[in-house]
Amino acid sequence: MTNLLWQKPGVAVDAKIQSFLAGDDVILDREFFLYDIAASKAHAQGLQHIGILSLQELGGLSEQLDLLAADFRSGAFVLDAQYEDCHSAIEARLTERLGDAGRKIHTGRSRNDQILVATRLWLKDKLQRVATLSAEIAEVALERAQAEAELPVPGYTHIQRAVVSSAGMWWAGWAEAFIDNAVRAGDTVHLVDSNPLGTAAGYGVNLPLDRAHTTAELGFARLLVSPIYAQLSRGKYELAALEALGSATLDLRRIAWDLSLFTSGEFAFVALPAQYTTGSSIMPNKRNPDVIELMRATHASVAAARTEIEQLLSLPSGYHRDLQSSKGAIVHGFGRGLAALELLPALLANLEWRPDKLRAAIDSGMYATDVAVEAAVAGVPFREAYKAAAQASETAGQGRTPEGSLAARVSPGAAADLQLDVLQARWQALRA
C-alpha cells in the first residue's frame, strides 16, 4: 500500500497493522468515489474563492477530477489496494498530474469531513431510490386494488380463517403501507440533507472557507453548522437512513410471507410467473419460490446493519476510527434492501390469483361476524349476538355469498368503501 497521506518522515509502517487499519475500506469506497470527486471539485472552488488556489490551478484540478471520474466509470482507473482509501487515491492522482496544485487540494479539509460529505450525498441518492421504489410499489397495488376490488379472498388472523375479505382490501393495505414508506424515505432525505464539508476534523479551521458555496454547489438544502455536531451526526444519519429503508423492507418481508403462504400447495391462492421460481437439484417436481423467500430474508440484513451502527455509536464526541465500520453497514444494508425492492413492482404486477381456490377456502364460519353485527344492528346487545353467532357458526353462511358479505362491509376503508380515491390523492402528493 502506498500514498499514505498521514505518514511521517522516518516512521516505518508495519504492513500487517496497516492492512488491519485499512480493512476493506478501499473496496467499500468504490461506492463513494464519485461523490468524493464531486465534493473535491466544490472544495477546490471554495479554496479559489479565498485565494488558496489560482484560477489556473482550479481549472486544472476541475479538469483532472472530471477525467478521474470518467476513468473510474469506464474502468480505466481502478480503486484498489495500492491506495488506503478513496481520499488518498484522489489526492495521489491530482498530485501526479498537477504537482503542487494537487498537494493544495486538502487545504482546510480533513478526511473526516471528506467522508462525511461523500456518504451524505450517497445516502441522499439511496433514500430517494427507496422513496421512488416505494411509490412504484404503491402504484401497482392501487391499480390492482381498483381492478380486483370485488374479488373475494379469505381473510386471516393468526393464520386461521377469519372473515370474508377481498383482493381489493389486500392490495389497498400494501398501497397505503408503501405510500407511508415513500413519505418516510423522503422525510429522511430532508434530515440528512445538510452539508458537513468545511468542518474539517471536527473543530473547524483557521480559514474563511466558503461553506455557503459548497452547500449550494453540492445541492444541499442547508449547512450543517457545528463542526462538533458534524462528527456526532456520523452514524446518527446512517441509522435514520437504515430505519427508513427498514420500514420498506419490513413491509417487503410481510408481503413476501403472504405470498410464500399463498403460493404453497396448501393454499394455492396465487400463481407466480416462472421467472420468480427455481427448481430443486434433486426433486424434479419442485418449483421453489426462492425470489420471495430471499426478499423475506432481506430485512434481516437491513436490521443487522442498523444494529451494527447503533453499537458503534457507544462513543464520546469527536471522531473515532470505530466509525469507519459504518461504511460497510450502509453499503451492505442498502445493497441488499434496494436489490429486493427493485424486483417487487414487476412481481406484484404479474402475480395471478386463482379465484376458484380463493372461493373454496371461504367457509360458513367466516360469516359469523356478519351475523353478530347484523343482530346488534337489530337491537340485540352485541355480546349476546356474539355468543349466539358463535354457537351457530357452522350454519352462519346459509343463504350468504362472499359478494354479499363484501357489499355489506361499508365502514370506511373496508371492502365496500376502499377509499381508493383518498389513497390515490396521497400517492399523487408523492409526485408533487
Curated annotation (Swiss-Prot):
Pathway: Amino-acid biosynthesis; L-arginine biosynthesis; L-arginine from L-ornithine and carbamoyl phosphate: step 3/3
A GO CC annotation given for this chain: cytosol
PROSITE patterns referenced in this protein's UniProt entry, alphabetically: FUMARATE_LYASES (PS00163)
Enzyme class at the top of the EC tree: lyase
Biological processes, Gene Ontology terms: arginine biosynthetic process via ornithine; L-arginine biosynthetic process
GO MF annotation, one: argininosuccinate lyase activity
UniProt subcellular location: Cytoplasm
Catalytic activity: 2-(N(omega)-L-arginino)succinate = fumarate + L-arginine
Swiss-Prot/TrEMBL keywords: Amino-acid biosynthesis, Arginine biosynthesis, Cytoplasm, Lyase
EC number: 4.3.2.1
Record-linked PANTHER family: ARGININOSUCCINATE LYASE (PTHR43814:SF1)
Recorded family membership: Belongs to the lyase 1 family. Argininosuccinate lyase subfamily.
HAMAP family the UniProt entry points to: Arg_succ_lyase (MF_00006)
Protein name: Argininosuccinate lyase
Organism expressing this protein natively: Xanthomonas axonopodis pv. citri (strain 306)
Gene label: argH
